[in-house]
């Protein structure tokens, strides 16, 4: 079974989307505690904070996305954005690198760490 690669921007967007649903679910749980106003308010506030956190994450990844390098994927010929030295295509999940020293090597996320020396 091969490893499934995923684009970093898509991973962060998926995390932000999951924060929205988790926040709504937590806030909805507060409805079951209508008798105790403190618990109900706590659940609703925590859910609201999760939704606000997702907004912050979406804003952050949007700003980060404007600074990324756009390249054309050699496999699907579609434009994709790269974060770091290695990343995956947003459309076909093809492993990509712009570092000549890493061409032909096995795809690994550790190449993006500052402590890694090629």
Curated annotation (Swiss-Prot):
Hydrolase recorded as keyword: no
Task: State the protein's name.
Answer: UPF0295 protein BCE33L0445
Q: Which domain of life is it from?
A: Bacteria
Q: Which Gene Ontology cellular component annotation is one that this UniProt entry carries?
A: plasma membrane
Alphabetically ordered keywords of this record: Cell membrane, Membrane, Transmembrane, Transmembrane helix
Lineage at the top is: Bacteria, Bacillati, Bacillota, Bacilli, Bacillales
Q: What is its main location?
A: membrane
Q: Which Pfam families match?
A: DUF2614 (PF11023)
Which residue windows are transmembrane per the record?
A: 12-32, 43-63
Q: Does the keyword field hold Membrane?
A: yes
**What family does the entry list?**
Belongs to the UPF0295 family.
**HAMAP family membership:** UPF0295 (MF_01502)
């Amino acid at each position: 079974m091969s490893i499934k690669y995923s684009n970093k921007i898509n991973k962060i967007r998926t995390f932000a989307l999951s924060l929205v649903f988790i926040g709504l679910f937590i806030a909805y749980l507060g409805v079951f505690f209508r008798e105790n106003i403190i618990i109900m308010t706590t659940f609703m506030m925590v859910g609201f904070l999760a939704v606000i956190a997702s907004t912050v994450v979406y804003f952050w990844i949007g700003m980060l996305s404007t600074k990324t390098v756009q390249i054309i994927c050699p496999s699907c010929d579609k434009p994709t954005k790269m974060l770091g030295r290695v990343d995956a295509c947003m459309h076909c999940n093809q492993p990509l690198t712009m570092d000549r020293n890493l061409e032909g090597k096995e795809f690994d996320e550790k190449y993006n760490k500052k402590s890694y020396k090629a």
